[in-house]
Amino acid sequence: MSTIEEKRHSLAHLLAQAILNIYPEAKLTIGPATETGFYYDVDFGTSKLTDQNLPKIEKEMKKLLPTWDTFESISKTADEAREYFKDNTYKLELIEEIISRGEQLTFYKSGDFIDLCRGGHVAHMNEIPADSFELDKTAGAYWRGDEKNSMLTRVYGLAFESKEELDVYKHKIEQAKERDHRKLGKELDLFTFSDLVGGGLPLFTPKGTAIRNAIIDKVYEIQGEYDTQEVCIPHITKPDLYKTSGHWDKFKDELFHVHGRENEFVMKPMNCPHHTQIFASKPRSYKELPLRYVESTMVYRDEQSGELLGLGRVRSITQDDGHTFCTPEQIDQEVKILISIIKKFYTLLGLMKEGNYRVSLSFRDPKEPQKYLGDESVWETAQAALTRIAQEENLPYEIFEGEAAFYGPKIDFMFKDAIGRERQLGTIQLDFNMPSRFGLEFTDKDGTKKTPVMIHRAIAGSLERFLSIAIEHFAGNFPFWMAPVQVALIPIKEQHEQAAKDLHKQLKALGIRVDYMNSNDNFGKRIKKAKDERVPYFIIIGDKDIEANKVTLESRDEGQLGQKSIEEVLQLFRELK
């Protein structure tokens, strides 16, 4: 039986033939399998293809399906290949690349269709049920992903083992559309964008800012238990900083350049090089270590406009950032501390449940030690420590050799959201490179100079991306501590407003985010507004409440909670905070 990847790859061929049958002047480029189906990038020339054209192409695919059987490997010489694709410059470019690498040209034929292909197809096309796939959408895509090249049309298809699996996936997609953070962000008045400000530069409203502050405050509250020290750095720097750190060669095309009166500056794309300079500002002793610097600050990356996506991919990025400077012997304890912080934070979000997360340990490739910086024994000690810690902390981990950065191994926490999508969030990264590049030193117990280890960590990571995930995970129904408005205070009529105002003062004194909805509007409209805004609790005050010296409490998640005394309500909110 063929794999789902082989089925998806085979369907990409079928899609290509269907396109040529309807658009014979189209130029095919490449068509791989994807995690959910397949696609083919096509140059349609003067023809314009939109989603409205997909049913016609899909119908042609299903008409062709029973006429195809197996995939046959076809041999062609270089000259034969060039002749066959003489009218397709894209295929010719691929052919020349394959030849230049000294690799063999391979072609596969099914039905009347022949394509340049490495292989990996079904044994027989009858393994693919006609109702297990469908065309999904079209999008623009540059040839080879380079914006300097031609713009092509990417035709996406979905494909699963059966119609049932396809339907389950489509249902998840519908859920995802309803939860889309761009849609909910607008409905809940959390953030906006402006053409005058620029793409990828979100503007947070008071409610969106309240959520951001709640997240940052919670991270600081948790990490504050571990003697962290808050630092603050400027948003621009001389290029020399990144030339020393080694980031210049990698990031120089993604930097925003600022020309001053005398010097050139760049907007910082990360914070770690700045933090090294705080460490380097005076002589350090082993007695000071570990030093745990933390900061919530913005960084800037000049992302391509086509890659921007709501809050998920932006140009101004708020990082919940931290860098620990420690001795190699302290790696174990420091990583455990960071895991503890991550566990506490994601437990609050309800994500730290068995079966809902996994941990990826990215290690160096032992077969290619020359690709990595730092002493081999330090790497081995660090990787052994990470493995041992993962076991001691009962983390569901996997080791991925060859996935480490050149400067150190790392731990990534992968969580499933409410509809089963896996999201990479918390990260712990060991760095043996940057301290050396900057000549960082501390005086050890024996009086010798040693180089510290640097540990990068992100709890929430990019706050914008985290918020996009949180909005979609909770569908706007944020937990009490995160909600932009935690309580809606609703007096029924004007005569109930004084009691509501008195309670409003008490709630504000507790630090509760309250929306006082006075009686100027219809009572029913105010209730609807509070529910539409997904406010966790409503407090209603009417005649019976004032007579009993109580209030009526309603929960978004639990429904009616009945009459409560003022002290009972205040105590509930103290505990929820």
Q: What is each of the regions a protein language model found here?
A:
Residues 1-29, 34-577:
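NTP/phosphate- and nucleic-acid-binding module
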